[in-house]
Amino acid sequence: MFKRSIVYQLDAGAYKPTKAHSSDAGYDLYAREDVELGADKTFKVDTGVHVLIPDGYVGLVLPRSSFNCMGVATPTGVIDAGYTGSISVVLSAKSDLKIYAGNRIAQLVIVPLPEIRLVEGDVMAHKSERGCGGFGSSGR
């Protein structure tokens, strides 16, 4: 049962976002046209998909695990409510790679946003187990 519908529109030659399984968190996004990715280069690949993210939600463009295994990095993208342009996906490849029109290149996950306001305060006075430990601080 669907609780909310998100309106989308496709440019000519674009592929409809799909889910392989109804329980999947994200919709697969597809390359609209063939693209040659050069080694150690970063490219913006157009999907030709427009979505109308409602107020109180955000669209996250996330990597596909199969691309990560192929040495293709996809940084997270954010689609704010009100943006109506075509979704593009940033891809970086370790080696030369051809992406064909119709290849799945990322996934779109739409999530609700809590209403939060940022207030200034003394963060360092807050004691926690983690503290200032960041990258690699857990020893793994």
Located regions from the model:
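DUTPase catalytic domain/fold
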Residues: 1-140
